[in-house]
Amino acid sequence: MHERYVPADVEAAAQSDWRAADAYRSKEDANRKKFYCVSMLPYPSGKLHMGHVRNYTINDVMYRYLRMNGYNTLMPMGWDAFGMPAENAAMANGVPPAQWTYENIAYMKKQMQAMGLAIDWSREVTTCKPDYYKWNQWLFLKMLEKGVAYKKTGTVNWDPVDQTVLANEQVIDGRGWRSGAFVEKREIPMYYMRITQYADELLNDLDGLGWPERVKVMQHNWIGKSFGVNFGFPYELDGEKKLLRVFTTRADTIMGVTFCAIAAEHPLAARLARDKPALQAFIDECKRGGVAEADIATMEKKGVATGFSVSHPLTGEPVEVWIGNYVLMSYGEGAVMGVPAHDERDFAFAKKYGLPIRQVIAVEGETYSTDAWQEWYGDKTRAVCVNSGKYDGLAYDAAVDAIAAELKAGGLGDKQITYRLRDWGISRQRYWGTPIPIIHCPSCGDVPVPEQDLPVVLPEDLVPDGTGNPLAKSDAFLNCTCPKCGAVAKRETDTMDTFVDSAWYFSRYAAPDAQTMVDARTDYWMPMDQYIGGIEHAILHLLYSRFWAKVMRDLGLVAFGEPAKNLLTQGMVLNETFYREDAAGKKTWYNPADVTVSFDDKGRPVGAVLKSDGQPVELGGIEKMSKSKNNGVDPQMLIDHYGADTARLFTMFAAPPEQQLEWSGAGVDGASRFLRRVWAFGFANREALAVRAPFDAAQLAEAGKTLRREIHGVLKQADFDYQRLQYNTVVSAAMKMLNAIEGAKGATPAVLRETYGVLLRVLYPVVPHVTFELWKVLGYADEFGPLLDAPWPKVDEAALEQAEIELVLQVNGKVRGALKVAKDASREAIEAAAVADGMFAKFAEGRPAKKIIVVPGRLVNVVV
């Protein structure tokens, strides 16, 4: 054993032992409790960041603790390898996305191995490999057969210069990110998955999940179940009588309708724009810019009057029709009723364009004014109808019932349940993704690729140039034969949304070599007992993976309908930011490692200079580590300098897993010092720690009993904290243990060996390398086996019992000292000890005790 702790040597030795033992390969065992813990698989961007380190360490700690407690544990890893960043990198570097992706995977895998993670690499999944995405294609075809997948036209962002479809994030201020051209909205045929068919089940099943309430609320709101009324405004055009249909949750305000707004893509808009250049120009303007709902929600609301009116369904009054840039064709009916008096968006729109505002609900004690919007204008809980004829005085529920009944009687509408959730459009007009297994035949139409011809393999040697889809230019991929009639045909060039790849990978981990999509091993491991990932995945990834599981269940592939029993959303890793701003307002961000900070006498930062030139930089505050703010810390540099165990210890100690973690160089130094202390104690006491002599706990001297009582008391708390995933307090417990062991005077070597062994096992899940090596070199492995499978230490309840207890001694209600008495001392004995104590004599000043109050186990108060 070396005197000095050298992390690189210790970690290399431990990892060598683990590789030789194939330590983390997991096998199904029906006779053992299983625990399947998964971190959301990373995108292979090139290097790990500290967010990865934190996520995977949390997973690893969980795995090791539960393995010590007898669970059959599994921690796999894979790569979410398709996606747009690879295409962008390929364009920038002139290499195929496949080459860039595989090189990144190789490097990041080495980084994970250097962290000492308990990953079963035999189950590794890479989503851009044909043996994985074959099953995306296979399930898509099954869904097509069942009607769960289907084709329809959908709206996309079209760059007219690059002649390509853009993702929402590639549209910046209405322009294409590469060409700078104004983006157009286009309708093209795309494939969809009928997730709305599962809307109620997706909502109801949230109740049974051990997920953060915040995530469940986000999914609940995204699904957005609404109870309302679907009805039509009658109109006549070109000799035909029709209805302009809308959906509303506020039918109680129908008498306040003063306009209707329709989407630019609405069929009525196109008809009304004939021979009206100004109206057509506005429609064209609306079709430019992104199609992202978030963008539309925040942009300026604009509208143009069409000069056409529909009839109010209950009064017959004319209602003017406008085209609004905020109305989405994909939501509801592509038309909305405008009630400016009681909808904030409509209120602003009406004020902007001078439209009538008609109050039709009132709240007692409130006064309505059209001068400015007030929150109560939209209140449906306290309001009653006014200015609404026969509906006056009705509260929300009664008004909706009555109005819906009248609309139904007139054949104009009825109550309806709707969802904010829309079917999942999976077609992407991109190269680097799962090919959609469809062949377009001039005679037969769209023909599914036969199952025996799967996978449709994506060529990996293409280099995108930003103009169009490379697959459409690849004759080798594009041209094929129709499997039905044998005619010359062409393949579908759209690829699948990458959320398809991440919707089921955890099921493939369970059976990575299966010749079917999944097998019996999947039902052994799934559902995941613990899933770990960022809050940013709360909606789309987690919702799609839940949908995918239910589809697989309904197809008879798996027995479960929810992929993850429990979810932990780890907090972000934050760091200081520093910048300089030029005359044009452009900020240049500097890495904290390149900056010297000065502090005031209270330790608060008051200034900073760049190390390279000594000139000031601005303090930008603490923000999430990111490339854009240049405030990241390279995990590899941290591992190279301090070792993986120090990195792991700091990330677990600095904050509870679900909270944000503020980076601290001093905290990293502190973690390193602690591990050196653990090693130094082992080295300094290596001979005493080698003593395996049994001992009778009851016969130990007081020093031994005191040490064991403290260690086993802290162990009890640490075990509880491990179970509730509070790893920061586990580390605190280990620090208390080391302090107690270092400070123990007179404890026998056997007691030191026992208590130091407890410390190593408590620390092991967090810092596996140094504890594994100490366990081995100090002889614990010879006695108990390698630390990998050493049992979790049991709390000795007898050690926690005390022969004496300490009571607070008060005189006339003021604390004057402490009193040690036998644990089972009688009230009379406690009273006698109190008046005999020197502190009582000092403060009583010769006065006799009038009354003695004893609070068992806590205090004794002598009144004089």
UniProtKB/Swiss-Prot annotation:
Keyword Ligase: yes
GO molecular function: aminoacyl-tRNA deacylase activity; ATP binding; leucine-tRNA ligase activity
PROSITE patterns hit by this protein: AA_TRNA_LIGASE_I
Enzyme class: ligase
GO biological process, one term: leucyl-tRNA aminoacylation
Catalytic activity: tRNA(Leu) + L-leucine + ATP = L-leucyl-tRNA(Leu) + AMP + diphosphate
EC number(s) from the headed UniProt entry: 6.1.1.4
InterPro entries given in the database record: aa-tRNA-synth_I_CS, aa-tRNA-synth_Ia, Leu-tRNA-ligase, Leu_tRNA-synth_edit, M/V/L/I-tRNA-synth_anticd-bd, Methionyl/Leucyl_tRNA_Synth, Rossmann-like_a/b/a_fold, tRNAsynth_Ia_anticodon-bd
Any single Pfam family the record assigns to this protein: tRNA-synt_1_2
Sequence motif 'KMSKS' region, location on chain: 624-628
Signal peptide limits: none
UniProtKB keywords: Aminoacyl-tRNA synthetase, ATP-binding, Cytoplasm, Ligase, Nucleotide-binding, Protein biosynthesis
Similarity comment: Belongs to the class-I aminoacyl-tRNA synthetase family.
Protein name: Leucine--tRNA ligase
Organism: Burkholderia mallei (strain ATCC 23344)
